[in-house]
Structures are given as C-alpha cells and as structure tokens.
Amino acid sequence: MDVLPTGGGRPGLRTELEFRGGGGEARLESQEEETIPAAPPAPRLRGAAERPRRSRDTWDGDEDTEPGEACGGRTSRTASLVSGLLNELYSCTEEEEAAGGGRGAEGRRRRRDSLDSSTEASGSDVVLGGRSGAGDSRVLQELQERPSQRHQMLYLRQKDANELKTILRELKYRIGIQSAKLLRHLKQKDRLLHKVQRNCDIVTACLQAVSQKRRVDTKLKFTLEPSLGQNGFQQWYDALKAVARLSTGIPKEWRRKVWLTLADHYLHSIAIDWDKTMRFTFNERSNPDDDSMGIQIVKDLHRTGCSSYCGQEAEQDRVVLKRVLLAYARWNKTVGYCQGFNILAALILEVMEGNEGDALKIMIYLIDKVLPESYFVNNLRALSVDMAVFRDLLRMKLPELSQHLDTLQRTANKESGGGYEPPLTNVFTMQWFLTLFATCLPNQTVLKIWDSVFFEGSEIILRVSLAIWAKLGEQIECCETADEFYSTMGRLTQEMLENDLLQSHELMQTVYSMAPFPFPQLAELREKYTYNITPFPATVKPTSVSGRHSKARDSDEENDPDDEDAVVNAVGCLGPFSGFLAPELQKYQKQIKEPNEEQSLRSNNIAELSPGAINSCRSEYHAAFNSMMMERMTTDINALKRQYSRIKKKQQQQVHQVYIRADKGPVTSILPSQVNSSPVINHLLLGKKMKMTNRAAKNAVIHIPGHTGGKISPVPYEDLKTKLNSPWRTHIRVHKKNMPRTKSHPGCGDTVGLIDEQNEASKTNGLGAAEAFPSGCTATAGREGSSPEGSTRRTIEGQSPEPVFGDADVDVSAVQAKLGALELNQRDAAAETELRVHPPCQRHCPEPPSAPEENKATSKAPQGSNSKTPIFSPFPSVKPLRKSATARNLGLYGPTERTPTVHFPQMSRSFSKPGGGNSGTKKR
C-alpha cells in the first residue's frame, strides 16, 4: 500500500506499509521525497480483501485462537503483535472516514492527514504543522514561539481576517485529530484492562481450587494492585500470600511491584512523609555519627558476596550500596548499622534495579516491620531468643537429630577439659538468621524465602531452618565428633550454595507443610525466652562501642590479630560472614590459655550467657526444668561464693565509725570489727524505747575530749572541777543555752525539759560512778554508731558542732585500749561484764532486741524510782510514757505475751529505723 501526500509546492512524507505473504511481517518506512503536483486516488490497503474486517473488540479476543499460537511462545507473540497492528490500521480507516467525510480534494487531504498522524511516534509535532499549507504551519510555529498570551494577541492583531480564519480552521482540525487518537488509546486501554481482569479471574479460580476450601478461601480475589476501599489492601494481601505458597511462587516480574506495595502501605500506616525522609537520609552533609558507621560499612563492602559488588568495575555499585546502608542508619539510629546489612541491602538493590529510594523502603519494611523487634540492635536480643526457640523446635520436630547433636556437644565438653563447646547449631543458625539465608542458598531460592517472609512474617525463618536441618540430618547423624560435624557442615554449606543441594520447590513445600500457621507454641516459647534470657554482649555489634567492656574488646582485637585469624579459619564454613563469631570464640580461647584472667573475663564469658547464646543441652532435665533453670544450675558455685565474699568485703570496708576529738584533734577511724555491736545511747532521749531512739543515734559523730594518743591507766578519782567539765556536763550546758531551739525538735522536748530538774542532783554524785559513763556507756554508744550507711555522718540533734570543754587534756586512751580489746564474737560476755560493773548504766541503757526480758525489766525500773531514794546515777531520770494498748498489741513496744519474740541478729541495729525517734514523744 502506497500513501502519497497531496498539495502543491510543499514537501511531504512517503509512508510504505508492505505486508509480505501470509506470515504477517510488517515494515514501516518513511523517507523524504519530492512534491507531487497531482492528487492520487484514495489509499487502498493491499490484502484487505483477503481478510474480512472485524470489530476492534473481536480482534483482541481472537488473539488466543491464532493458528500459530500452538507452535510456541515466539509464534504466539508474533501473531499478537500482527493482530494489534492490523487493529490499529483498521481503526485509522474508520477515523479517517469520520474525520474527513467530505468529498473532493479537501476530503482526501483530511483523510491523508488522519492516516499520517496515526503513524507518528508523538503528537507533539502536530502543532508545528507539516500537513497543512506552508503559511499556516509558519503561523502556528510563530505562535508557539510566543508562550505568553499578551505576545500572541499582539501577533494575531497584525493578521487580516482571512489569515485568522485559516489559522482557526487548521487548529480545529488538529484538535480533532488529537481527540481521535486519545479516544483510540482509551479504547485500547479498556481492552487491555479487560484482558488483565480475565487473567486475574483465572488465577483466582486456581487459588480457590488448591485452597483448603475454608470460608475465608472463598473470599480470595486476585488482583495485581490493591483496589480502592476499606478491604482492598487486605484482599490483595491474602491473594498474594496464597500465590507465594504455590510451587512457582511470585513471578520475578511482579516481585518489585509487590514488595514496593507492601512497603508503601507500611509507610503510609505510620504517617511518614517520604519526600522529607529522602532529603534527610540521602543528604550530602556529614552527620556526627556518619564517620564511625561509614568506616565499618566500607570494611564490610568487600564481604558482601554478590558478584555485582566485587571487583574494580563495580565501584559505582558499591557507592550506591554504601549510600543505602548509611541512609538506613540515619533513619533508625537505634539499630544503626549491623554486620550483615550489606548482604541484605545488596540483594534488595538487585530486586529494585538499583533504585536507592525503593531499596531504603524495603529495608525499613523488612527490619522495622517484618522481623522481630531488636533483631539487629546492639545486643541482638531477639536473635538470641530465636536461637533458643529454634533449639526447642528442633527437639520437638527432629528429636533424634537434636539428641545426636547434644551428645556430640557433651562429648566435646568432656574431651576439651577446661573449654566449652556451644550448641552445635548456633554457629550456623546465627548466620542464617542474620542474613536471611542469603549466604547459604542460591539467589532464586532466597528470593522465594523472602517473599514468604514478607507475607508470613519471621516465622518462616524458623521453618526454613528446620527444613534445612531435616534435609541434612542423614549426613549429620553419621558424624561421631564435633570436629567431624563442623567439617561436614562446611562441605554441605558450599554444596547448598553452589550445587543446588536443596530444590527450591521441595524446600518451600516442606516449609508450608510441617505445621499449620501460626506455628504451635511458637508465641509461648518466644515469650518465655524473651523474659528469661541474657542477650549477647553489647560488643557483638562492631559499630556501637559502648559500655565499659567495649574498650577491652577493641584492644583484644587490635593486639591479637593472629588469634582472630585463627578463629576465623576454624569456622571457615561461615563464608563471608565468618568474622561475626570471631570475637566471642577468641575470648573462650583466651580464657583457656590464661586462667588467671578468669575474673576479668567473667562478664564476657560465653559460659555465663543464658539460652540465647549457649545451652547445656541436658535433655534428661528438660522435662522438669526449663532452659533458664538449667543455665543457672550449671553456674559455678565456687565462683558465686567468691563473688559474695568480695561484695561482703567491700561493704565492710565502706562501714566505719569516725571518732573526732572535741578540740579539733586528729580523726581516728575504727572498723566495725574492732568494736562490739551494742545499742547506741542517745543522751537526749534517755528513758525512751530503743525503737524510738535508734534513728537519731545512727552514724552519729561522737566527740571524745582530749585525745592525745598516749596509753595511760584511767584515774579512779578526780577532783570536782574535772568532773564538772566532763563531756556529759558540757552537753547539759549547751542544751540549757539552746533550750528554745532544742524543744522545737520532735522527740526531744520531753527529755530536755527534765534535764534542769536533775542537774543539781547529778552534780553531787560520787566520782567513781561518774567515771563509769565514759568507760562504759560512751563506748557502748560508739560501738552502736556504725551501720552500713557509715559513709554518711550526722550530728545528734541539739548538739553543738564544736563543743568547748573546760579541760581539753582529758585522756581517753583507756577507752581506745578497751575498744581494741573487744571482739565481735564476744558480744554476750562483754554485755554481762558491763552489767555487773556498771549497774546504773544497765538501768537506763536499753539493750538490743536480742534480750527482750532484760529490756522489759529495765523499762519498768524508772517507775519505782520516784518513791524511793534516788540511786546514784549520772543520768537524769525521765518519766516513762503511757503506752498505747493498740501499739502494745501490734508489738511496737517490744515482745509481749501476745507478740512472740523474733530474733534478727543481722538486723538488730536497724530494727528501730522506721520509728526514727519522732513518734511517741508527746505526753499523754
């Protein structure tokens, strides 16, 4: 068919459409030729008579019934292209008749332009002309060069009416041509959508045919994109989940669009402004955290394992990979960068065809949404949980293999002597979980697994691991030692990666058929190990150097590179991910080589990590105890004892009693082991119950006058002037001067009010009895003042901070000599001696709760002292308080007939702490 343009004196295009034979090959040629002065007859399609005309809808429907379709995919595709081309040609003929219905030269010209315009690649040049007169085309071109409306109006005002009518007629004609083309494309779109919908219905019928015929399966409706509406996405999600379960899985042509649809829906659900996120994550400015992460990312790029990211020619691809990893580290600063991300990002970039933004979307959806929380955080807590859960699932599904591996582990522990062999599956499952099997299985199999992970969740990871161990179980059961097991697994790992040891369709069939979804008891196991597990040390993550052990880890890795290389070679079956366990295994070797450093490495010892890192694998105790209890049972008891001894020693060193000289002399520190623990005496609260007086006296700074450091015997008799300047008299004088301030303190008003009444009587007491106080009761107060809170020093309420004594040379070295001779294990003997030598002191000094009967008798003694002659005593007598019946029944006043005696030897000094001396001081 030859179509020749008309119109005198202007160039045209010659279009030749030639159909050769019945094969249906078409050739379109366009070339410039000289103008033809005469108009040829109307164009005629050669071969149109042999093929009857059909409607446009019937051509699309007859594509599937072409005779050549049975000859193969290529013949079917050629027939489809030919049918589409013929459909376009017949459509052009109909539009030609509709657009150029007139007769004569004008009608032929319009029909010619309509046909020629359909063969153009783009309609943008239609406005420029070439089909109408040269003058009209020049005018339209000049109009297009003036974009503003003002300039166009000025240009058109210069034209006469005939020229304007010609321009208007030409514009209307070309608008009609473009409208016809648009209508034709819309009709073609409708036909294609109808065909797609018909194919989707076929897929829906197939899915329902292979389903379990449940009620929810009847609602399956397959679509390529989520439809609008409330349940549109969920319907699409369920259908694609069913497609992923088929043996063929999701086609690779759909994978990119399917993954992006899932990621976009997640980002929309959390209300993320993606444009703003892209500007933040991919900006060229360097953040403070970028340097450390960038260094680690560059170190791991050569270990990616993908061929497209290795070699000198892949430099640009590595730059893109680094940008994606750095962008995710900026997005999720909690996770940052973890070793193994480079493998995940490389595979995602391959699916996303190198698009950085799309790859970042998939990483966010995979790590933040699909995988468990804290799967890649600093301590890999969720990873350790899944490793412990996997061992339990292995015992449930493959009991023989699990028992065989436990036997190999116990044998290795016995033969190694002081070493420790972790569970044999840990070395491999850690690598599988962190890289999602990208380093141990072929690429196509990994992508199918990832499709299932995106739709089914992280449960697929455990299922695939069980399926792999089940496949390799026959060869593993032949191993007799742990070394043979590692050698066999290294060989099998290479075969799985290179020789397709596992068929993808068989593997996925095993994954979906081993148990119903969700996996029974999986949620309970994860919850149990989540709250009963110690995660990996924080130093496992290379880029986050935090904590006090990180520096030691870094120094070990820097100082001992040979040891690290040896460990990496020992676990060479890990491939590009073999360096991940090197730091931990290196520490175990150091622990064996240097037993003297056991205490310093105890915090990083893998033997003390709970089920997430290691497990004793004692199957005989599994029925009675869970894994957490087994870990605690295997803990070294001697180590716990040594640790307890160190803690106790530190506490004893922190507890000390400080004796300060009253005249600003040197400070003498006495440890609690040098004094006897007896009740402290608060001189301002004499006569009160011990429960009410212990708080104010604890950790008190006791002032001892005249400490010269010499050792002399105590003087039995002193003159009256020296006795009046004793510490007790000084306390009385100070409180008489500060009476208003002292009475304002709770718990002290009653006692201070009685000091005046007995001050004169106390001055006339004998000298020998007056000497008994500093040697007996003062020492007792000093012994009681120590407590675990000894680092805090408090002054007794109402006491002057710097009391001034009349005689500053009073020597109390005898008190120190006696304190040094006392022992903690002679508490009772010392108490009895003091009772015999100093009866007045016993009368007024309360005893610890360990002697309730004596305390009860002592509390009753002051009641009878009012009617009898006052017994010689340096202490003022205090009127006892009326006791409350309710408090007595509750045991607040000590043991009675209704409240039995309870001894707390270690809590005797803190027994009365809640009372604090503030309650029970008001007279009733």
UniProtKB/Swiss-Prot annotation:
State the compartments where it is located: Cell membrane
Q: Where is the composition biased (Acidic residues)?
A: 555-564
Question: What residue spans carry the Basic and acidic residues bias annotation?
Answer: 47-59
Instruction: Give me the stretches of Polar residues compositional bias.
Output: 858-870
Source organism, top-level taxon? Eukaryota
Key word Cell membrane present: yes
What is one GO biological process annotated to this record? positive regulation of GTPase activity
InterPro entries the record matches = Rab-GAP-TBC_dom (IPR000195), Rab-GAP_TBC_sf (IPR035969), Tbc1d30_C (IPR032738)
Instruction: List the GO molecular function terms.
Output: GTPase activator activity; small GTPase binding
Segments traversing the membrane: none
Protein name (database record): TBC1 domain family member 30
Question: What organism does the UniProt record list as the source?
Answer: Homo sapiens (Human)
Output the lineage of the source organism. Eukaryota, Metazoa, Chordata, Craniata, Vertebrata
